[in-house]
């Protein structure tokens, strides 16, 4: 085997080595091939180089031949009777591109078709040396693109370095015949520089014989003048590339179409213009006295110029062209002091001197291109030359030349009153600015000649351009249901500048309403397009170039993950799609209100001061009322019907329209106040709309008729869309309003039947007193309108689309009367129960009478509940959170209410510690019914029901922002506007001895404003009477309880807001049902009624704490009384005085699952104590937030939103908890997934709720075990004590009652169990363990036997379970 292995290894090694060798060979072959290819490429390159060298040699030979020919041509054409004029460049020959110093994109071939030239030519003019040919000049590009040739230089002013004696032959300018034979000398030395520049311009390989041959075709001076005239027209480049046609003058050969095709950047022609321009520049730069031998007669001391009919062809002025490298040609022309005097020809062919017609300068400021020229040529056309006629030219330089000076001022003919005299046409937009914006306003010669004129003009033009913003025409909105187009931006956008998060949210909100079938929207196609359409409306800032990047960064920023949700690219394969996690109405909600903390606190102080001055006047009642008319439907002000889009600056008209619609229902003295407030509201709306129009990017130019027409069409379309949306909105509102009325009527039908009798009795008793109070309240209301309305009329908008008012629970009828909104576009309806239909004239009075200044100030015709607001708003929170205590209200009304209670109150020693409700209609002390308290409790019940419906509707709410958490701390108000309350649980039924029933509803609201009154906690043991002489230690007990309660109340101030939100909205309602009804006419539906034969003068009832919003009903009997206005717990003690002269107190918790303590009283009425446990913060009815992490620290900048559990959700969770998680704490995966899908909860949230629920069960079991040990310990120590009324002395053990339907009957007349609440002082940071307490049981005997309290202080650390 080893041998086989060795053979295998050798074979494998050999195989591998062969593979390696093959690879190496292949690599070598490839390298060889590459080397061969490289060698071939090198050979090819060498061949190419050789060919190029040969070509260069051939070109050099050709150039030498051409030079030789050029040297021979002047000698061959040397004739004494002919003169040679400087000719234009090659017109029919092509010029190679590589031989020109100027880069040309195109080459044009020009033809000259005319008669042959008969003028004499001199051979000695163009004799050149080779040295002059090879000489180079550095000014290759400086003097190339001038505008016009001017042969003007006087010999008297010229300083020539070389002087030559020239004799020219005079020829007839018309016939071209030679007049005399004149011998000329060579002028080659004068023209050497000119010829060298000419060759450098036109190329070295040009045959100059062609020039001479071409010039032979020009027959006379007229054609020469035509050629020169064409050179002054830079636009004379036609479609056919012909300079001179066979027939007709030159000015008639070029149409306007040919001028329009003039290209400034591709002016690559080699025409007569360039040649003559070179000649003119050469003459001016080198100061030559003569350019070429002229066929004309030479005037003394002047350069001869060609003439046609006695008119000079060329004007007399010099061009000092300073061409910079940047192509900025600033030509400052200085006139010669001496003019050229040239006149018409006489009979002897001599000219008489005449002055020039015009004196003008060339102001050429060519900024961008070299093709911008001034058309200052005197000649209008060769055949039409008049002294009084200006030239005709056309300029098509629109964008490249800002200085097209076409208006030239003549010395002899300068009429400012005739603007049409100069027929120049300028297509540039700056022409009007250049001429001062008015026709005929031209500048003087001195301004044109000023060296600073062009700079000033350029500066003015640049300033005008910088001041004009770029015209951005927004795209019209294409969405049918657009909230922004219909209603404008939300109200919070006007209180503070909106952030980009707010802008993105409102954009996604409107997109969601317009396209509800789509969940995610693309950032560029949808979101940015929507923002672009409404940028000036919602952004309220300047449009920048990077605002789209800002939107992208905002949507993807981690700070706004709870607002915006990005679609997963893994699921659908798409990127850049965003949506909203939770949708709320930004026209109602306060989340977008980002005012500073200082401003909000200042507003709070102002509101509190007004409330103190006005005596708790409801802010809604002071707002102007509006009657039903055509412009209003269900209390909504349609402010967008004022056509503010069409009125740019007409705010007064809009105000008048709104005032007419808003002031129809103003009664008494409120008309002036309402008018002022409506003006404020309407001005705010209309100013915003007008700003949107004035800041629109469309610039209204007086001549832009198309833009104005387009804008008017857009406005008309928007107006039509708004009308259609308004009609649809009204129809939907009407339908929904009817549906809500039907539903609410069915829900409240039974409840109304129970309240009718109470309302009627209350009306009969307080009708007279209410009429007196109404007159006083009307005066207060009129005096306070200005103060209240000034803070709440700043924002008034119309309702958003597809969002309707969440009306509160109404009783019977909901009138279409409405109140002006505080900060939302909705005007909330008032829940009024009217008996008659005519309420137009009575509503205002009813609103005034519905103030809460006293318990008795209720509407005379019907039971009225407070107007409830359906949506959270900043001003609403101010209103609700700053209500004064109910105790303060009652204290202020005691003076007026004591007059009616004098007949019923028999005891003058009654002590009212804080506040007591009124006692009325109780005669003789027997069968007394507290009517005022009864009716008050009914009102509070209705208010709580309204709060339930109110808070259930506010489900989809934006998460908390940074500043929202400060509102709750500032107002010290525990009701959270984001909470969704849980409906009432099943009430527990207990049998309490015989014929004694109390149907009590506890409104245990926590009020931080009552902390000063907490020292007088439910300590009703401080009753000193003659019957208490047997209890020596009673006072000591009371002192001990007072100390504990004071400590507890002082220590609970830190955690009032976070811990006590559990006790609200009827979650902790305890109702007692009985087998027999009361004998009173109200039946068992009236709460807080005790029907006894005789009430003990010392009997007390443990009352619920009164809150700022829902004051609980409180009542007392004839004896001395003391109320508890402190912060009590959910469990309450019910006091019942039986016929058998024995009393029992049963304490139950809010859920009804267990009985905490039982207290029984004997018939001696010696000692009374209440049982009020403050340890129900751990009950099941609390929200589903986890116990520790649910409420974060106050220092946390980002507090989590409180999540609450609805009743239907709690049912699912309880079922799952009882079946799976209660015993072993384990889950069922399938059931857990099903539960998560049904509730739309995440698994982590369900886990937190279950853990919190299990922790509460542990705490409850521990509490029950402690109470059990305390109760048995008390019974064992008091086993020898018996009662005279009961044979049994055993106490039944307290077992937790987990079933709500179970009934227990407990009767222990032999013992008196009095519980003393010893609340532990918990100053820990744990917010959920604030009010835990341990029960202290005191056994009190009957008759005269003194007893000592048995204190069982079990210091069990319950906090360890939560930690």
Curated annotation (Swiss-Prot):
Supply the alphabetized keyword list.
Answer: Coiled coil, Developmental protein, DNA-binding, Homeobox, Nucleus
**According to the UniProt record, which residues make up the DNA-binding region?**
1198-1261
User: What biological function has been recorded for the protein in this entry?
Assistant: Putative transcription factor.
Cellular localisation: Nucleus
For this entry, the protein name equals Homeobox protein 13
Q: Does the keyword Coiled coil apply?
A: yes
Basic and acidic residues bias: start-end ranges: 1064-1078
Top-level lineage group: Eukaryota
Annotated coiled-coil segments of the chain? 15-73, 738-789
State the organism of origin: Dictyostelium discoideum
């Amino acid at each position: 085997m080893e041998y086989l292995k060795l053979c295998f290894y050798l074979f494998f090694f050999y195989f591998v080595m062969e593979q390696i060798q093959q690879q190496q060979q292949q690599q070598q072959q490839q390298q060889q091939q590459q080397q061969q290819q490289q060698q071939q490429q090198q050979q090819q390159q060498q061949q190419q180089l050789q060919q190029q060298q040969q070509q260069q040699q051939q070109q050099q030979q050709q150039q030498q031949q051409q030079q030789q020919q050029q040297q021979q041509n002047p000698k061959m054409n040397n004739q004494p009777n002919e003169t040679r004029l400087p000719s234009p460049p090659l017109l029919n020959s092509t010029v190679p591109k590589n031989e020109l110093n100027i880069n040309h994109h195109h080459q044009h071939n020009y033809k000259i078709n005319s008669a042959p030239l008969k003028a004499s030519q001199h051979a000695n003019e163009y004799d050149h040396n080779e040295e002059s040919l090879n000489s180079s000049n550095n000014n290759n590009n400086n003097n190339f693109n001038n505008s016009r040739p001017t042969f003007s230089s006087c010999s008297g002013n010229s300083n020539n370095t070389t002087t030559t004696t020239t004799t020219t032959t005079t020829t007839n300018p018309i016939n071209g015949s030679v007049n005399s034979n004149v011998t000329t000398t060579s002028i080659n030395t004068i023209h050497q520089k000119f010829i060298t520049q000419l060759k450098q311009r036109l190329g070295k390989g040009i045959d100059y014989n062609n020039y001479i041959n071409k010039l032979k075709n020009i027959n006379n001076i007229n054609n020469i003048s035509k050629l020169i005239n064409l050179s002054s027209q830079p636009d004379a480049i036609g479609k056919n590339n012909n300079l001179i046609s066979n027939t007709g003058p030159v000015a008639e050969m070029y149409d306007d179409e040919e001028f329009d095709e003039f290209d400034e950047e591709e002016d690559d022609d080699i025409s007569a213009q360039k040649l003559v321009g070179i000649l003119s520049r050469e003459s001016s730069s080198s100061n030559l006295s003569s350019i070429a031998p002229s066929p004309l007669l030479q005037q003394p001391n002047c350069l001869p110029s060609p003439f046609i009919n006695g008119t000079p062809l060329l004007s007399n002025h010099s061009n000092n062209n300073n061409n910079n490298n940047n192509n900025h040609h600033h030509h400052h022309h200085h006139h010669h002091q001496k003019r050229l005097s040239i006149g018409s020809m006489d009979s002897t062919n001599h000219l008489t001197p005449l002055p020039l017609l015009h004196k003008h300068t060339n102001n050429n400021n060519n900024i961008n291109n070299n093709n911008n020229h001034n058309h200052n040529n005197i000649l209008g056309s060769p055949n039409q030359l008049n002294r009084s006629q200006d030239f005709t030219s056309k300029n098509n330089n629109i964008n490249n030349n800002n200085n097209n000076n076409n208006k030239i001022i003549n010395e002899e003919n300068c009429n400012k009153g005739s603007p049409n005299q100069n027929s120049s046409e300028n297509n540039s937009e700056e022409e009007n600015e250049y001429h001062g914006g008015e026709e005929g306003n031209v500048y003087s010669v001195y301004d044109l000649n000023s060296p600073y004129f062009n700079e000033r003009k350029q500066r003015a033009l640049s300033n005008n351009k910088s001041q004009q913003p770029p015209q951005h025409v927004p795209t019209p909105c294409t969405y049918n249901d657009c909230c922004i187009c219909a209603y404008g931006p939300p109200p919070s956008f006007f209180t503070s500048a909106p952030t980009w998060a707010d802008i993105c949210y409102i954009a996604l909100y409107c997109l969601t309403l317009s396209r509800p079938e789509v969940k995610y929207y693309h950032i560029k196609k949808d979101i940015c397009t929507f923002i672009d359409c409404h940028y000036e409306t919602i952004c309220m800032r300047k449009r920048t170039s990077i605002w789209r990047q800002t939107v992208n960064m905002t949507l993807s920023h981690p700070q706004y993950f709870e607002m915006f949700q990005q679609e997963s690219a893994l699921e659908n394969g798409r990127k850049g799609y965003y949506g909203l996690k939770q949708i709320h109405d930004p026209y109602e909600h306060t989340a977008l209100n980002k005012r500073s903390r200082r401003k909000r606190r200042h507003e709070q102080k102002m509101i509190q001061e007004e409330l103190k001055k006005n005596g708790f006047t409801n802010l809604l009642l002071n707002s102007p009322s509006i009657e039903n008319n055509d412009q209003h439907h269900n209390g909504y002000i349609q402010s967008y019907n004022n056509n503010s889009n069409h009125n740019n600056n007409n705010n007064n008209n809009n105000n008048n329209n709104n005032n007419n619609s808003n002031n129809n229902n103003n009664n008494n003295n409120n008309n002036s106040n309402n008018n002022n407030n409506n003006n404020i509201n309407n001005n705010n709306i209309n100013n915003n709309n007008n700003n949107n129009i004035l800041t629109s990017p469309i610039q209204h130019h007086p001549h832009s008729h198309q833009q104005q027409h387009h804008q008017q069409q857009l406005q008309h379309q928007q107006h039509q869309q708004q009308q259609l949306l308004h009609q649809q909105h009204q129809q939907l509102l009407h339908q929904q309003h009817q549906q809500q009325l039907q539903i609410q009527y069915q829900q409240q039908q039974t409840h109304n039947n129970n309240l009718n009798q109470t309302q009627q009795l209350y009306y009969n008793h307080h009708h007279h007193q209410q009429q007196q109070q109404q007159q006083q309240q009307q005066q207060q209301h009129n005096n306070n309108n200005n103060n209240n309305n000034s803070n709440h009329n700043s924002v008034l908008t119309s309702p958003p689309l597809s969002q309707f008012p969440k009306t509160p629970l109404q009783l019977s009828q909901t009138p279409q009367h409405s109140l002006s909104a505080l900060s939302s576009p909705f005007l909330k309806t008032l829940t009024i129960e009217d008996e008659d239909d005519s309420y137009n004239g009575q509503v205002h009075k009813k609103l005034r009478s519905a103030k809460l200044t006293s318990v008795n100030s209720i509407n005379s015709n019907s039971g009225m509940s407070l107007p409830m607001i359906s949506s959270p708003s900043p001003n609403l929170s101010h209103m609700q959170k700053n209500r004064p205590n109910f105790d303060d209200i009652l204290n202020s009304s005691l003076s007026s209410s004591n007059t009616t209670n004098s007949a019923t109150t028999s005891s003058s020693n009654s002590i009212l510690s804080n506040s007591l409700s009124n006692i009325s209609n109780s005669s003789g002390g027997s069968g007394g019914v507290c009517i005022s308290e009864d009716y008050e409790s009914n009102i509070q019940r209705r208010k709580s029901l309204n709060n339930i419906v109110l808070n259930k509707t506010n489900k989809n709410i934006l998460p908390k922002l940074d500043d929202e958490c400060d509102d709750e701390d500032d107002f010290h108000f525990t009701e959270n506007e984001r909470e969704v309350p849980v409906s009432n649980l099943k009430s527990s039924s207990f049998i309490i001895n015989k014929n004694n029933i109390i149907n009590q509803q506890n409104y245990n609201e926590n009020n931080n404003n009552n902390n000063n009154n907490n020292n007088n906690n439910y300590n009703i043991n401080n009753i000193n009477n003659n019957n208490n002489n047997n209890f020596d230690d009673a006072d000591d007990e009371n002192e001990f309880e007072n100390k504990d309660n004071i400590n507890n109340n002082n220590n609970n101030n830190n955690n009032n807001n976070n811990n006590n939100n559990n006790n609200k909205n009827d979650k902790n309602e305890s109702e007692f049902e009985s087998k027999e009804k009361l004998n009173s006419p109200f039946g068992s539906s009236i709460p807080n009624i005790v029907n006894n034969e005789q009430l003990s003068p010392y009997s007390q009832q443990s009352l619920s704490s009164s809150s700022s919003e829902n004051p609980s009903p409180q009542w007392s009997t004839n004896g001395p009384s003391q109320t508890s206005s402190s912060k009590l717990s959910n469990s309450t003690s019910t006091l019942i005085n039986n016929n058998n002269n024995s009393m029992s107190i049963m304490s139950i918790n809010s859920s009804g699952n267990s009985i905490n303590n039982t207290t029984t009283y004997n018939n001696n009425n010696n000692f009374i104590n209440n049982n009020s446990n403050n340890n129900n913060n751990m009950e099941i009815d609390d929200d589903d937030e986890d116990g520790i992490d649910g409420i974060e620290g106050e220092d946390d900048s980002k507090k989590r939103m409180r999540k609450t559990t609805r009743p239907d959700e709690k049912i699912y969770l309880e079922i799952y908890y009882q079946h799976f998680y209660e015993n072993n704490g384990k889950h069922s995966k399938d059931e857990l997934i099903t539960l998560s899908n049904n509730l739309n909860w995440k698994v982590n949230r369900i886990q937190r709720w279950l853990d919190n629920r299990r922790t509460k069960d542990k705490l409850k079991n521990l509490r029950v075990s402690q109470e059990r040990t305390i109760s048995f310990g008390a019974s064992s120590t008091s086993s020898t004590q018996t009662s005279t009324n009961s044979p049994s002395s055993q106490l039944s053990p307290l077992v937790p009652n987990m079933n709500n339907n179970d009934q227990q009957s407990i009767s222990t007349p032999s013992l008196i169990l009095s519980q003393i609440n010893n609340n532990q002082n918990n100053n820990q940071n744990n917010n959920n363990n604030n009010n835990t307490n341990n029960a202290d049981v005191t056994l009190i005997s009957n008759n005269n036997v003194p007893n000592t309290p048995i204190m069982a202080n079990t210091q069990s650390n319950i906090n360890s379970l939560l930690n």
